[in-house]
Amino acid sequence: MYKGIAGSEGIGIGNVVIIEEHEIVIENKKITDTDAEIARLQGAIEKFVNDTNAMADRMEKTVGAKDADILRGHIQMLQDPTIEEQITALIVSEKITAEKALDQVLEQTAEIFAQIPDELLQQRATDFRDIKARILKILLGIEDYDISTAPAGTVLVAHDLTPSMTAGIVAENIAGILTEVGGRTSHSAILARAMEIPAVLSIDGICTSVKNGDRVVLNGTSGEAIVNPDAETEQKFAELLEEYKKEKELLKKFAGVPTVSADGTKVELVCNIGKPEDAKKAVECDGEGIGLFRTEFLFMDRDTIPTEEEQFEAYKSVAETMKGKPVIIRTLDIGGDKEIPYLGLEKEDNPFLGYRAIRFCLQRTDIYNTQLRALVRASAFGRIKIMVPLVTGVDELRSVKAMVADIMKELDAEGIAYNKNLEIGIMMETPAACMMADVLAKEAAFFSIGTNDLTGYTMAVDRGNSKVAYLYSAFNPAVLRAIKRIIECGKKEGIMVGMCGEAAADPKLIPLLLAFGLDEFSVSATSVLKTRKTIADSSMAECKALADKVMACATEAEVQAVLAQQ
């Protein structure tokens, strides 16, 4: 059995087709006609742009505009004027080939992103290397395997599936995907989920461990794959596949209905999004609102701070898409771990404990005031709420509320409409906020528990460090006690308490969260129906009995043992 990262859920059974990467050999030779070489480069770039637009158009018809935009983003990345200028300057100054110059510039750019300790930004390195490889192949006349010709029942095996490769997939012919690299946030995982193809990623050496035609069964939910299984194992996976199909069909009946427990307790089931266009997916998947809109995307992949108008349009579009449903927008959560040169952030030894999020914003009030103005203005177009990240004390919340009050006075003077009852809440993700939750609940309009960071900070663990990653678990009694305390403090003051971390969609944790009194579950759009079903299958009496047993546990192992008995 091969174990990897669960990239896209589902069961797959099929035959291996290995996507082999052609070796790209770049000659180290000098040229004399630099104009001709620059013309070669421009011709290759033009073909790349045309091919990419065609692929994106095909992808939009099959999986939608959001995922097609990943490919269109490659064009935007390449059209950064400084990149082509650097390549042509190298051709002229060093008298080297277009291939050599392109390779140097794009590899240097990719390496910058690869060094950033942020999984989403590291993905930019993969993007630039994909762009580089495709243009080099155009220059060298190399043609890749046409994935669109893969026969039905194919399990694609590759070192990595780039967006350009994935664009050619005919979804009904692909039973599964196995790769040697990639994670949950990689483009290969995102596109596999969009096409509903089970995928297991980051299986070391899988390309050399299988051969074309090998039989494979895989579980994209657990991250497991078996090559050339015996008849009994394949039959077991065939049964799992049928069960999975039945479950997907069953979930359809949970669309368009309220989120209510088996004994009538109503909760809100909303979505996490990262871009304005994601709001459409939230609506399509029956989300009841937006529980977390990360605004960092507006500040990335650009050379200047986004204007008030740019931000206003982004926030307004989400509010309008949600048509009166609640939209919680988290203010800028950025720090030294993210490469945004124009912000002038210094590299820090421990950026997750450093100058970031609200700490950065309250010192750079020029940037923060612009964002808050845009948010307050956008509140006139829907049920927008403002959420402040990484709060450790009530003084930070008071500072934000004071800034918003001043902005409202300005807008009154300017005759600009806004919601005068705009709510300002807190992302509860630090031990300090947990300890001060009783005080914070008196001044915050709502709490939203960010379990990802709350777990990391509470357990003092870097989840990227494999030696201590075992400590990173929301099932640890310390984390569960923190969550329970936050909810209790919020309830005492009568404010809404939600959760926007991964724990909100965990079927084993949901009964505990219901017992604790969580009001709002914010999950990925694709998890909405599954989470609603889990809640509908839960009775509060049983949840509370389970929570009593769990809260008496002293270790995570004890917690897991109790949950395993349910």
Predicted region positions:
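Conserved alpha/beta-domain cores
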Residues: 248-566
